[in-house]
């Protein structure tokens, strides 16, 4: 039995039409699910009894099971969820000045093998289904509505999505696209495409395919190194798609979409954080419609990497080369909020 959360509005319309129901019923169902937060088909009273019976017999509306909910002093909330096959995934709520941002997971584990990342310690087991990605947002939305029941400032709903959790989103390409479709649909969450950011470590063919769609969603490149020598050491994907190929894909994306791109750069002590590295990075991305998001490293005991003590100098070196850059705020340092960290600790892989 399929979860109804996996379907876009168009897909649900087609299913209903094939079964002799009206296409407009899909809009009614979406309104119940996403506007009224009702998942019980029997309570969808403007649907015919026959349709409610059909839905109950052919679809489920199961959400994720919360295993852990950790709330940080800075307001960050990290959830560990159990899936139907007893695997676990993480989702993070990050309150921002501009709204409520949620970081979602797209895979159980990750095969990209980035040596500094807690996610990569657990290899990819499977892709998440669309409903499993959607359910993360749905669950956090419910959490916010319960936390701020009478709020009128927007704090009680998810407004921004970053697809930067466990896994490589473009390695789960079709499901990620359907997820974005549902997020963006005014009949569902109604989250504007420019409030959605998809991150990739550099799957060049998928970056180009994503560019061809000309979506208004944001693209972030997990770069983390200014040259092939360093990137080969910490990101195995670079051996398949070295920086010259990655930068060609970036240029293609910018040309096709006319959208600014983000380069994410985790600063790791004595690995990629020297002033010389900053100058190399500036030369690599000079002239591109882009900015750099400098990220303090969140340490994992099981690997030798440590947080850089040279962040300020690196930032100033980029600025001196006229590179747009920011240092990202650290979220949830007191609650194991690094990507994959909570899950790995619970499963006994990290200490």
Language-model features, listed with the residues they occupy:
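Canonical Radical SAM [4Fe-4S] cluster-binding loop centered on the CxxxCxxC motif
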Residues: 95-144
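Short linear Ser/Thr-Pro motifs
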Residues: 72, 105-106, 119, 199, ...
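Conserved AdoMet/S-adenosylmethionine-binding subsite of the radical SAM
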Residues: 145-151, 157-325
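Short polar/acidic secondary-structure junctions
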Residues: 71, 84, 94-96, 188
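Generic beta-strand structural signal
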Residues: 77, 89, 100-104, 112, ...
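Auxiliary Fe-S-binding modules of radical SAM enzymes
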Residues: 1-89, 148-149, 251-260, 265-351
């Amino acid at each position: 039995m399929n979860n109804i959360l996996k379907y876009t509005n168009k897909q649900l319309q087609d299913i209903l039409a094939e079964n002799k129901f009206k296409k407009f019923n899909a809009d009614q169902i979406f309104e119940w699910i996403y506007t009224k937060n009702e998942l019980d088909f029997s309570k969808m009273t403007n649907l015919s009894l026959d349709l409610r019976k059909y839905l109950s017999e052919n679809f489920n509306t199961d959400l994720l099971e919360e295993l852990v909910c950790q709330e940080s002093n800075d307001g960050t909330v990290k959830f560990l969820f159990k899936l139907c096959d007893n695997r676990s995934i993480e989702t993070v709520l990050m309150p921002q000045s501009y709204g409520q941002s949620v970081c979602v997971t797209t895979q159980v584990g990750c095969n990209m093998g980035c040596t500094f990342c807690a996610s990569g310690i657990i290899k990819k087991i499977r892709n998440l289904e669309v409903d499993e990605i959607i359910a993360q947002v749905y669950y956090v939305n419910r959490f916010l509505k319960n936390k701020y029941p009478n709020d009128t400032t927007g704090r009680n709903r998810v407004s921004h999505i970053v697809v930067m959790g466990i896994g490589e989103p473009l390695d789960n390409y079709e499901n990620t696209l359907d997820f974005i479709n549902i997020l963006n649909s005014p009949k569902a969450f109604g989250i504007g495409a420019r409030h959605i950011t998809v991150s990739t470590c550099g799957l060049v063919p998928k970056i180009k395919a994503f560019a061809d769609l000309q979506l208004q969603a944001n693209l972030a490149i997990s770069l983390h190194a200014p040259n092939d020598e360093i990137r080969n050491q910490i990101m195995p994907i670079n051996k398949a798609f070295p920086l010259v190929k990655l930068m060609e894909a970036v240029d293609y994306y910018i040309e096709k979409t006319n959208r600014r791109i983000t380069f994410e750069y985790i600063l790791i002590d004595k690995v990629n954080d020297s002033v010389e590295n900053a100058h190399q990075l500036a030369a690599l991305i000079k002239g591109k419609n882009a900015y750099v998001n400098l990220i303090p490293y969140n340490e994992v005991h099981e690997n030798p990497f440590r947080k850089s003590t040279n962040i300020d100098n690196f930032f100033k070196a980029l600025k001196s080369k006229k590179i747009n850059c920011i240092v990202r705020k650290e979220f949830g340092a007191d609650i194991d909020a690094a990507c994959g960290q909570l899950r790995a600790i619970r499963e006994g892989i990290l200490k």
